[in-house]
């Protein structure tokens, strides 16, 4: 029973630790690239479309209001 409990665990060597860290860095870079793609291809265009329409609506309303004031 003592032999079963006396397991030797090899410490992670520096090379394996660097590989693990490198894999984490690669995964993080991939995740950031995916987030950038989603923002650039989906979020920013939709936000720009929404804000552009809001701005155009308010600009058109102000122009019509000024036109009515000048006409009267």
UniProtKB/Swiss-Prot annotation:
Gene disruption phenotype: Abnormal localization of atg43 to the outer mitochondrial membrane leading to abnormal mitophagy during nitrogen starvation. Leads to extremely slow growth at various temperatures and delayed commitment to mitosis.
Residues on Cytoplasmic side: 1-34
Record-annotated membrane-spanning stretches: 35-52
Enumerate the Mitochondrial intermembrane topological stretches: 53-72
Q: How does it sit in the membrane?
A: Single-pass membrane protein
Give GO BP annotations, semicolon-separated. Answer: mitochondrial outer membrane translocase complex assembly; protein insertion into mitochondrial outer membrane
Query: What is the induction comment?
Result: Differentially expressed during meiosis.
Q: Identify one Pfam family in the record.
A: Mim2
Q: Where is this region: Disordered?
A: 1-22
Give the intrachain disulfide bonds: none
Q: Which GO terms describe its cellular component?
A: MIM complex; mitochondrial outer membrane; mitochondrion
Any idea which UniProt keywords this protein has? Membrane, Mitochondrion, Mitochondrion outer membrane, Protein transport, Transmembrane, Transmembrane helix, Transport
List localization entries. Mitochondrion outer membrane
Q: What does this protein do, in the record's words?
A: Component of the mitochondrial outer import machinery (MIM) complex that mediates transport of proteins into mitochondrial compartments. Promotes the insertion of tom70 into the outer mitochondrial membrane. Promotes the insertion of atg43 into the outer mitochondrial membrane. Involved in import of the subset of proteins with multiple alpha-helical transmembrane segments.
Q: What family classification does the UniProt entry report for this protein?
A: Belongs to the MIM2 family.
Q: How does it assemble?
A: Component of the mitochondrial outer import machinery (MIM) complex containing at least mim1 and mim2. Interacts with mim1. Interacts with mitophagy receptor atg43.
Q: What is this protein called?
A: Mitochondrial import protein 2
């Amino acid at each position: 029973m003592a032999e079963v409990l006396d397991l030797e665990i090899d410490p992670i060597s520096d090379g394996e630790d660097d590989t693990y860290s490198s894999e984490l860095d690669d995964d993080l870079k991939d995740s950031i690239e995916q987030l950038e793609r989603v923002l650039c291809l989906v979020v920013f265009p939709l936000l720009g479309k929404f804000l552009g329409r809001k701005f155009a609506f308010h600009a058109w309303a102000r122009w019509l209001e000024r036109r009515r004031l000048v006409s009267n």
